[in-house]
Regions:
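Acidic, glycine-rich segments characteristic of secretory precursors and extracytoplasmic regions
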Residues: 20-70, 116, 123, 133-139, ...
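Long, intrinsically disordered, low-complexity segments
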Residues: 19-20, 107-110, 189-191, 267, ...
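Conserved, well-structured interaction surfaces
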Residues: 45-61, 79-157, 173-217, 381, ...
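Extended amphipathic alpha-helical segments enriched in small hydrophobics
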Residues: 146-147, 224-228, 480-521
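Bacterial Sec-dependent N-terminal signal peptides
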Residues: 1-29
């Protein structure tokens, strides 16, 4: 009962934090009847809010399938509490009978609601008290949402039926049994609709105090670029595995022939979006120290990385999903870093970043740990004692594993670990000279109320103003989930440019903007001076690997890795392996027992089956024109 009260307390705080966005959080008890929905501006606005209500709660790790269905996080097994259904996908439990995290029915319902709104709002005899400008903007918002829901379906299922208009209620039964449309047609439809929507939208919301979360032109064009990148990626562009994937009438659903023009179109779209974002005042976030206390350059860099995700409505956010709450994500990620409050049972650390992610981050020289010719990571569990010079990243004079030393700033910004420093706003001295840290071997304060299974923590997702106390209370600053931020768009552009034209100064430019904020040298400097493969960045395949790594590192814990591994068509290589971490049963007086690589699970990814979701058997039985995805 106590824990339920704590959760309610957090939810109350979340509501306060998002009071300015209450419009997007107001969903009518029932979808308004058409008799009343378009009689006035206020009623039409409620219907528009219903269009928004089908956006996913991306900040909830139990809802956002990208958090638990891949290899980025792992949970303790069995899970005593909480929603971990999506984790069953990672454990091989997907099914055609009742597909886990299926969105087929929900998103098509959202599309139908958007269609109804668009059909009625276009009739100028309705909603007579609505201004022309507002009618235009609302039309653009609903058009985008309709396109976005199609994108979510495409991303998950591949070829899908396009529902451009609602069928009349008396439509013949045969007309309702729609078939799936080819992926190229789906991608072009979504991209064109988003482009049309963008022409009706403004660069910025008119009133930030009430309108944040509304769709704007930068959102529409940035998501259009992402859609086109997905359509150009190997899963859907030149994938021979789908050469025989056809509708019952023989129509090919995924073209097995590679088409480079798709990458060129994606690159053009990304550049257009970048230019619009610039004109809208969207730029890379940099932390400004307003604490009144000195902070080292090392901590300042880490705070720029952390707050790019967690600072509400910061200047890098293109689309912040204010329909979501991140309290569950933060609660599940926060470590017991304050020894005075180690007994706080309201903290429930469950999300454990895997060794796949830990090893993914670069060295301090900006190259993969396997490529750095100046640093030896052959024995990642070897014990090493942190020095005074390393005190802003690791606990001085404390032993930790080799893998936790000499890493890039994003490693220390994104991950909490045994022996690591964890700066927060309420740090004891308010400086980073005397700040919180994490000691989480058995018998230490960090493990008082349990560890994550891997003993790593996703520090990045926890807002630096999170506070918890000895009396089991906490203060949590919620933030809109960053569905799209500028770094994401820059990476999409760099990827598309390399795939379309090969290595160029333009690709390096946008990669290096991100690397500069991350506190590492340029691509050229890092590979020339530190890599065992100094010319890697000069070839298209080599630069592709660098772009992939850069994306995994920059977008860690934001729900990108799960989908990127699939669209790059490398999930079968990455997700057929062991889930590894340290031994959480290792004790404080025996660090060797803690730093023992432990396998928790062996994943089995079956290609091509697991690249796409299965359609539910029930849907196939109702509509015989639908065909199942290959392998299911």
């Amino acid at each position: 009962m106590k824990r339920k009260l704590y959760w309610l307390q957090i939810l109350f705080i979340s509501v306060l934090a998002f009071s300015c966005n209450k419009y997007l959080n107001v969903v009518p008890d029932n979808i308004p009847t058409l008799d009343n929905a378009f009689t006035s501006r206020s009623e039409a606005e409620k219907y528009l809010a219903t269009c928004y209500s089908f956006l996913d709660n991306e900040g909830d790790p139990g809802v956002n399938v990208a958090y638990l269905a891949g290899d980025e996080f792992w949970l303790k097994y069995p899970q005593p509490t909480g929603s971990s259904t999506n984790w069953n996908i990672a454990r091989g439990g997907q099914s055609v009978v009742n597909p886990i995290a299926g969105i087929w029915g929900d998103k098509y319902k959202g599309i139908r609601v958007c269609n109804t709104f668009l059909e009625n709002i276009s009739d100028t005899t309705k909603v007579r008290d609505l201004s022309i400008d507002e009618r235009t903007r609302w039309t653009g918002e609903a058009m985008f949402l309709k396109a976005y829901y199609h994108f979510l379906l495409f991303r998950q299922y591949g070829a899908i039926p396009i529902v451009d208009k609602n069928l009349p209620i008396n439509a013949p039964l045969a007309q309702t049994k729609v078939k799936r449309q080819p992926v190229d047609s789906v991608v072009n439809y979504i991209a064109d609709l988003m482009d049309s929507a963008s022409k009706k939208l403004l660069n910025n919301v008119i009133n930030p105090s009430t309108d944040y979360g509304h769709i704007t032109k930068p959102i529409a064009l940035s998501m259009r670029a992402k859609v086109l990148v997905y359509g150009a990626s190997p899963l859907f562009n030149g994938n021979k595995d789908y050469a025989n994937f056809k509708n019952r009438d023989g129509q090919l659903l995924i073209d097995p022939d590679f088409d480079i023009s798709k990458w060129k179109k994606a690159a053009d779209a990304a550049k257009e979006a970048i230019d619009v974002c610039k004109s809208a005042g969207i730029y890379m976030y940099t932390f400004i120290n307003t604490t009144g206390y000195p902070l080292s350059d090392i901590t300042m860099t880490q705070m720029s990385i952390r707050n790019a995700m967690c600072e509400p409505w910061n200047q890098e956010i293109i689309w912040g999903n204010s329909s979501t709450s991140t309290w569950g994500l933060q609660y599940s990620s926060m470590a017991h870093i304050d020894p005075n409050n180690a007994g706080n049972t309201a903290i429930g650390p469950t999300l454990g970043p895997t060794m796949n992610v830990v090893e993914q981050f670069y060295t301090k020289n900006g190259v993969p740990i396997s490529e750095d010719k100046t640093l030896d990571f052959s024995n990642i569990s070897q014990l090493r004692t942190a020095t005074h010079e390393e005190r802003f990243n690791l606990i001085e004079n404390y032993q930790s594993a080799r893998i936790n030393f000499d890493r890039e700033p994003r490693f220390y910004a994104d991950l909490g670990f045994d022996g690591g420093v964890w700066y927060m706003q309420n740090s004891p001295s308010h400086t980073d000279e005397d700040t919180w840290n994490l000691k989480c071997r058995l018998g230490q304060f960090g493990a008082t109320n349990g560890n994550t299974v891997t003993t790593y923590y996703p520090k990045k997702v926890v807002n630096w103003k999170f506070v918890f106390n000895s009396d089991n209370t906490m203060y949590l600053l919620d933030y809109p989930f960053p569905t799209m931020r500028l770094a994401d768009l820059y990476l999409l552009y760099a990827e598309a440019m390399n795939e379309a034209y090969g290595p160029s100064d333009e690709v390096y430019k946008y990669l290096n903007i991100i690397r500069d904020r991350a506190g590492i040298p340029t691509v050229q400097e890092s590979w020339t001076n530190y890599s065992k493969n100094p010319s890697e960045y000069t070839t298209q395949s080599g630069l592709r690997a660098i772009v992939h790594d850069e994306r995994n590192n920059e977008m860690a814990f934001e729900g990108s890795r799960f989908w990127d591994l699939r669209r790059w068509k490398i999930a079968a290589q990455v997700l057929n392996g062991n889930i590894v971490g340290w031994d959480a049963n290792g004790t404080a007086d025996n660090p060797e027992s803690f730093y023992k690589l432990t396998t928790y699970f062996t994943m089995h990814f079956v290609a091509p089956r697991d690249y796409l979701w299965p359609l539910a058997e029930g849907d196939l039985q109702v509509n015989e024109n639908l065909v199942q995805n290959p392998g299911w």
